[in-house]
């Protein structure tokens, strides 16, 4: 009986880990699919017919496009990797019991006192320093130590998707070359149905699906990026935004430095640029009331 319970618990843990990594696999698949499709558009200058093109791209122009594209892809992958490797939790952090004061709480799950802005994540099953939210796309919490990589990843995803949308303008031109018809509308809105019913080829479906994904992804990432940039400029976390609290607003420049580190003005160019955070994730300067009602 004990062996059966142990086996079930191991299976459940495996399923749980698989579910946690599934969003990462799906996101990586989408990113590389978009990159491959845009590379094809750059190299083959498809799907426009030669008669529809005003001019052909030179080899140097194509090379510049590909270099810019793979720079953005590399930045996304590197920031995402460092985000996942950088634990935002309290594991390995020593809390001095003498400094427990206003804003501190006791976590009964972790069985320890936790500092202000720290909260327990039931998905990660641990308390997270300056916890912002649990990112379902990466399967990990966004907190004090990895916020920089999260924000930079959003920035390069936004730039990459904007570039992909512009490059996929050719796809929309081809689909809408005869105007907004029932066929073109269905191909853009529900390309899966058009493929299953045999109304379009696999190639047309692929171009339409990825073009749609680029537009939808760009809108979603734009919303996330602008929201989190706004939070950073106000010195807030998502949880503090929900409760309309701004007790840690130190001014725009200081708020940016708190999130991105001392070299905030250049660290966004490359995740390998060192940029030490000015705080420790435990003690924060307070400029307002910690009471959410004030």
Each predicted region: which residue ranges?
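Membrane-associated feature with strongest affinity for ZDHHC
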Residues: 1-294
């Amino acid at each position: 009986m004990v062996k059966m319970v142990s086996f079930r618990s191991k299976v459940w843990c495996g399923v749980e880990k698989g579910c946690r990594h599934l969003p990462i696999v799906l996101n990586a698949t989408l990113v590389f699919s978009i990159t491959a499709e845009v590379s094809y558009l750059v190299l083959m200058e498809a799907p426009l017919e030669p008669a529809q093109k005003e001019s052909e791209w030179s080899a140097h122009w194509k090379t510049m496009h590909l270099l810019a594209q793979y720079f953005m892809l590399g930045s996304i992958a590197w920031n995402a990797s460092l985000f996942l490797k950088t634990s935002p939790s309290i594991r390995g952090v020593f809390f001095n019991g003498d400094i427990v004061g206003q804003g501190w709480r006791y976590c009964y799950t972790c069985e320890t006192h936790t500092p202000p802005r720290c909260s327990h994540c039931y998905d990660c099953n641990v308390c997270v320093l300056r916890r912002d939210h649990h990112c379902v796309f990466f399967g990990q919490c966004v907190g004090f130590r990895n916020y920089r990589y999260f924000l930079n990843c959003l920035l390069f995803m936004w730039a990459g998707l904007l570039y992909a949308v512009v490059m996929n303008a050719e796809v929309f031109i081809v689909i809408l070359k005869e105007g907004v018809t029932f066929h073109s509308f269905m191909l853009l809105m529900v390309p899966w149905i058009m493929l299953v019913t045999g109304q379009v080829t696999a190639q047309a479906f692929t171009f339409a699906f990825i073009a749609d994904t680029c537009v939808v992804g760009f809108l979603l990432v734009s919303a996330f990026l602008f929201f989190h940039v706004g939070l950073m400029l106000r010195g807030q976390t998502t949880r503090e935004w929900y409760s309309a609290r701004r007790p840690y607003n130190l001014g725009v420049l200081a708020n940016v430095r708190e999130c991105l580190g001392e070299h905030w003005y250049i660290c966004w160019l490359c995740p390998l640029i060192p940029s030490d955070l000015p705080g420790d994730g435990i003690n924060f300067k307070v400029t307002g009331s910690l009471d959410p009602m004030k």
